[in-house]
Curated annotation (Swiss-Prot):
Free-text note on domains in this protein's UniProt record: The PPPY motif interacts with the WW domain 1 of BAG3.
Modification sites for Phosphothreonine: T333, T610, T626, T755, T774
Region (Interaction with ACTN2): 481-663, 664-924, 901-1093
Gene responsible for this protein: SYNPO2
Organism: Homo sapiens (Human)
Record's subcellular location: Nucleus; Cytoplasm; Cytoplasm, Cytoskeleton; Cytoplasm, Myofibril, Sarcomere, Z line
Main subcellular location: nucleus
Name of the protein described by the UniProt record: Synaptopodin-2
Biased composition (Pro residues): 617-630, 644-655
Keywords tagged on the record: Actin-binding, Cell junction, Cytoplasm, Cytoskeleton, Muscle protein, Nucleus, Phosphoprotein, Tumor suppressor
Length: 1093
């Protein structure tokens, strides 16, 4: 169409027509279409904004005022016919869309097509800008053919020089390569701010076998380095972008360029159509759509023929181009993935024009994504380049965007590196050129263009206002990843600080790994012993780790932490923390830790987990550790003698931070605490610590007190309790029979008390009392060891023999303490005398109860319920006083209580009552009515005689302990009450005699297993030791006794009682330290009636 072409447009259907008019005679302006609604009748009929209305339904509009035109339009009801005059500078949207569709259809036949639509921001004032597009042939004959086509009026120029060469490898038949030159020439004739144009070219290059990606160089642009001093002077700027294939031969070739001048308001379509001879050339189409009131004739250039088809019409554009779209199609090549389009979602500014890839088969989801992107783009463009830049919404948007950018931290991620890797994988990467024409505008487009950090394409920026052409190469930015951008603010500082601290922490960890020297220097004498112990413990910890993986308990975790630090100092602490971290915090019910352990080994693992004290007493440590016997005797005997006595090696604070938290994980600053989440600990573990701090019952001194017979019945029926060593192999069965949940509860209570022992002597006492609870779990056999170490300190030295015997009754510690032979005998006598026959060892039995009852404060702590304090203790005391009112026979009750004091653990799990020892239980015997209960007096007739002897000595205090035990029946250990072999009864009488003799006798007897009562007890886990029939536990005891007690104990009973108790404890694992929670020990009150055959 020529300039001022007239077009007749008809619409039917009645109002609304979907367009708005402006002007009129009164305004001395022609009547024009001011606005057209999308998807309206006007837009569908091809009406465009800026069209001049000549007539409406045959009524000329030149002499009509605007109100008259409105009346005329309102009078039209059915059909509307308009004659419009369209200026040559504009082109109808319908025609544009048709042209685009035709072009795209034509291009898709060739293969992969990429299209991009970009916005060109109009300038406030018009200016003349010229673009020069010049395709070039590298061969001379082709260059000569370029003149064959008709020239566009005054817009075609010839040039030679650097060019944008796009020369894909041609078939061998082709004599040369064809390069495509894109020369952008700008002619500025006015100072007014110009339009902002962003042009992105993505050209996919065909790659043959030997082809490789082209290298892109950006030469030239020297002409435009400095702004034009004279604003009125028109000047040209040319930017040459050369893309030269790497496989290009060195042979020279001629370059000639044809420049097509495009005025700012014209449509240019340059198509390189591959013909038979040019199969390797891709097709490029660039469409410049004109803005309102502008019309452009397409200038069609066929690269193969090098001819320009259509002339460029003259005429000045009133506004710069509003739309630029181009498509690149590569024929005969594989579809190339556009790396940028894949990463559009990660780019910060999504309103930038992108390459929309048109595939032959596009999924519905992809189409939806494209639609969503186009919508977002349109919204973003409206915001960044609004028709009215001073509108309130646009200003608010700009303000908020500036604020957001100011307070937004730059991501320090490695997305750039990942993107490079992705691009390398793509078969044929396309070379992308980005040309940005920047003019002064309020849309902040320069921010949008230059802020795309993820883009590694070449960007050429033209700023017509300043006269500068900024060429920014955004090539591989991997080297810049090391440098943080210039960011300020709290976030950046926090990040930097945190990274420094993390580096320091990692460095410290590495140093600790390399040199495991303890941070705190210890005395020279202690250092050697500690080193040996540490090495041993490390080995032990490894074994424990493997064994305890099947059965881990709360006690195990907490004690393991506390234990290692004590022996190792800080290095030990870090080691422990690592172990703790390795140990899963799963709190689901599991078999007790000791259950998996082997008879001899279990003790060591338990000790490791439970407490440092336990480690020393345990037999394996003795044999493995180098320290002199004195140290061992000191470590073992001193705990027994005085609970308050700390172990010889240095101990950190009871639960110092190192125990629970790795020092490296302690974060000081608040920011770091926020950025690094705190290490999570299980709810149960936290509850355990809390309970340790504030137990319902505070047992200052564990006493050996009779357990309610109900508990004894439960455990006996299960046949799980092997006293002392007996608990080793039996523990698995015992724990399982109790039930996973019950076991967990028992462990948790013991763990609470255990935790303190490693910390301080008092904790040690608590641990001893809690250790009985541990016995419920395999802790008794292998795991109790940790518990027992606290027990040693708990027992008083003077009453150590009796107390230790009771403690030995506890299965867990017996292995740890081989020394207490007297103790072992005592506990055996106690239970035997009470249950089996008082005649055999009435005195020992009495003495044990006496210690328990009479010395609750001193001896009681270790054997009996310790002096209880706290609200729970008060409640129990009240209940006890109430119970006494209803006791049928107070003497009988007292007798039973005294009998109960004899440690039940002394009865071996394998021990069975002989006819001598027991009387058959009544047919209707109910454990609830056991002597410990007031009503039990009626049913406890057979054992009444025994209680009478032992019971008188102990009166109401044993009842208290029993009451406590009653309230915590779930904590009883069935393993304490296992009666299997009848051999035990023989061992019992002998054992009492052995106890009288001396610890040495016990030691001697233990290794021989058959000869002495102690040995049968240990080996057979007979009545006293309640060691089920475990031969290995005896061996373990013998082993422990020989290293520990053999060297230190040889002295004699006076000096050896403690050692003796320790060795016997190894053999007699049953130590009768009992807290209310240690129902296992309480079970000591064995009644013949309760016995199961």
């Amino acid at each position: 169409m020529g300039t001022g072409d007239f077009i007749c447009i008809s619409m039917t259907g009645g109002a609304p027509w979907g367009f708005r008019l402006q002007g009129g005679k009164e305004q001395k302006q022609p009547l024009q279409v001011a606005k057209i609604r999308n998807q309206s009748k006007a837009s569908g009929s091809g009406l465009c904004e800026g069209d001049e209305v000549v007539s409406i339904n045959g009524n000329p509009c030149a002499d009509l005022t605007y109100p008259e035109v409105i009346k005329l339009m309102e009078s039209i009801t059915d059909s509307l016919q308009m004659l419009i005059k369209r200026p040559s500078s504009g082109i109808s949207e319908a025609l544009i869309s048709e042209n685009e569709n035709k072009n795209l259809e034509h291009l898709t036949h060739g293969g992969y097509v990429e299209s991009t639509t970009l916005q060109i921001r109009p300038a406030t004032k018009t200016q003349c800008t010229e673009f020069f597009l010049a395709p070039v042939k590298t061969e001379v004959p082709l260059a000569e053919n370029q003149r064959s086509g008709p020239d566009c009026a005054g817009s075609l120029k010839e040039e030679t020089g650097p060019s944008y060469q796009r020369a894909p490898q041609m078939p061998d038949s082709q004599r040369g390569r064809v390069a495509e030159e894109l020369i952008l020439r700008e002619k500025v004739e006015a100072v007014q701010p110009g339009p902002v144009v962003e042009l992105q070219l993505s050209l996919s290059q065909e790659r043959h076998k030997g082809a490789s990606g082209p290298l892109v160089a950006l030469p030239g642009a020297e002409k435009s380095k400095s702004p034009d001093p004279d604003p009125n002077l028109s000047h040209d700027r040319i930017v040459h972008i050369n893309s030269i294939p790497t496989n290009e031969k060195a042979d020279p070739f001629l370059r000639s360029s044809k420049i097509i001048q495009i005025s700012s308001g014209r449509e240019l379509r340059v198509i390189q159509e591959s013909e038979a001879g040019d199969a390797g050339l891709p097709r490029v189409e660039v469409i410049l759509d004109c803005s309102d009131r502008q019309k452009t004739e397409g200038c069609r250039l066929q690269a193969g023929k090098e001819c320009v088809d259509s002339p460029v019409e003259g005429g000045q554009s009133e506004a710069p181009p509003s739309l630029v779209s181009f498509a690149v199609s590569s024929e005969g090549t594989e579809q190339g993935e556009d790396p940028r389009s894949e990463k559009d979602h990660s780019r910060p500014h999504k309103h930038r024009a992108r390459h929309a890839r048109l595939r032959r088969s596009e999924s519905l989801s992809e189409k939806q994504v494209k639609e969503a992107k186009s919508k977002c783009k349109s919204i973003a463009l409206l915001l960044t380049d609004a028709p009215n830049p001073n509108s309130k919404g646009v200003l608010m948007f700009k303000k908020r965007r500036r604020r957001a950018r100011k307070y937004t931290l730059v991501s320090y991620g490695t997305g750039e590196l990942e993107r490079e890797a992705d691009e390398e994988e793509e078969g044929d990467k396309e070379d992308t050129c980005e040309v940005a024409f920047l003019g002064a505008s309020e849309s902040e487009v320069d921010e949008e263009l230059l802020s795309d950090v993820d883009d590694n394409t070449q960007v050429v920026n033209f700023d017509w206002d300043s006269g500068l052409v900024d060429i920014e190469k955004k090539l591989n930015r991997g080297d810049k990843m090391e440098m943080l951008p210039d960011t300020t603010g709290k976030g950046a500082l926090m990040f930097a600080k945190r990274r420094e601290r993390m580096d320091q922490i990692t460095a410290q960890k590495e140093e600790d790994k390399v040199g495991g020297t303890p941070s705190r220097e210890q005395d020279a004498a202690q250092t050697d012993g500690l080193r040996t112990t540490t090495s041993y413990q490390r080995k032990e910890e490894e074994s424990v780790r493997t064994q305890s993986s099947v059965s881990k308990s709360y006690i195990e975790v907490s004690h393991g932490l506390g234990h290692v630090p004590q022996q190792n100092g800080f290095s030990g602490t870090s080691e422990t923390a690592n172990i703790q971290r390795m140990v899963p915090m799963n709190r689901t019910a599991k078999p007790f830790p000791g259950s998996v352990n082997q008879p001899a080994t279990p003790f060591s693992p338990t000790r490791n987990m439970t407490s440092p004290i336990a480690d020393f007493p345990a037999p394996p440590p003795y044999s493995a550790v180098t320290p002199p016997p004195d140290a061992f005797s000191r470590g073992v005997s001193s705990p027994i003698a005085g609970p308050a006595q700390p172990p010889p090696w240095p101990q950190p604070a009871p639960w110092s931070q190192p125990a629970f938290y790795d020092s490296s994980e302690r974060i000081a600053s608040r920011d770091e605490r926020i950025s690094v989440p705190a290490k999570r600990t299980g709810i149960l573990q936290e509850a355990k610590r809390r309970s340790t701090t504030k137990p319902m019952f505070t047992f200052k001194e564990p006493k050996v007190s009779p357990n309610p017979e109900l508990l004894s019945l439960l455990q006996n029926s299960e046949g799980k309790r092997g006293t002392g060593a007996g608990g080793d192999s039996g523990p698995e069965e015992d724990y399982l029979s109790l039930g996973a949940e019950a076991c967990n509860f028992m462990q948790s209570s013991s763990a609470k008390q255990k935790t303190p022992p490693p910390v301080a002597p008092k904790p040690a006492v608590k641990s001893s009392s809690s250790q009985p609870v541990t016995p419920v779990s395999p802790v008794w056999s292998p795991g109790v060891a940790p518990t027992q170490p606290p027990a040693f300190p708990t027992s008083n030295p003077s009453k150590g023999t009796v107390v230790s015997s009771i403690k030995i009754a506890q299965p867990s510690y017996p292995p740890a303490r081989p020394a207490s032979t007297l103790n072992v005998a005592g506990p055996f006598k106690g239970p035997q005398a009470a249950v089996a026959s008082q005649n055999y060892t009435p005195k020992p039995t009495v003495s044990t109860p006496t210690v328990n009852a009479v010395q609750p404060g001193a001896v009681g702590p270790s054997n009996e319920l310790p002096g209880m304090s706290g609200r729970g203790a008060q409640l129990f005391a009240k209940r006890q006083s109430r119970m006494e009112k209803y006791v049928v026979d107070s003497d009988t009750v007292q007798a039973h209580a005294a009998r109960a004091q004899s440690p039940t653990p002394s009865l071996p799990a394998s021990w069975k009552y002989s006819s001598n020892v027991r009387a058959p239980p009544p047919v209707a015997y109910n454990p609830i009515h056991s002597p410990s209960y007031p009503l039990a007096a009626l049913k406890s007739q057979p054992s009444a005689a025994q209680p009478s002897k032992m019971g008188k000595k102990k009166g109401k205090k044993p009842l208290n302990a029993l009451d406590v035990m009653k309230h915590q029946p779930y904590q009883l250990n069935a393993s304490l009450f296992t009666f299997q072999p009848p051999d035990a009864k023989d061992g019992l009488p002998q054992k009492s005699s052995v106890k009288v003799n001396s610890a040495l006798a016990m030691k001697q007897a233990l290794p021989p297993r058959p000869v002495n009562a102690a040995s049968p007890t240990n080996v057979q886990a007979s009545s006293v030791y309640s060691v089920p029939a475990y031969t290995s536990p005896p061996s373990f005891f013998a082993e422990a006794s020989s290293p520990v007690s053999a060297s230190p104990v040889p002295v004699g009973i006076p000096t050896s009682p403690k050692q003796e108790s320790a060795s016997s404890s190894y053999f007699v694992a049953p130590r009768p330290k009992f807290s209310a929670k240690k129902s296992g020990v309480t079970i000591q009150v064995w009644k013949p009636s309760v016995v199961e055959e």
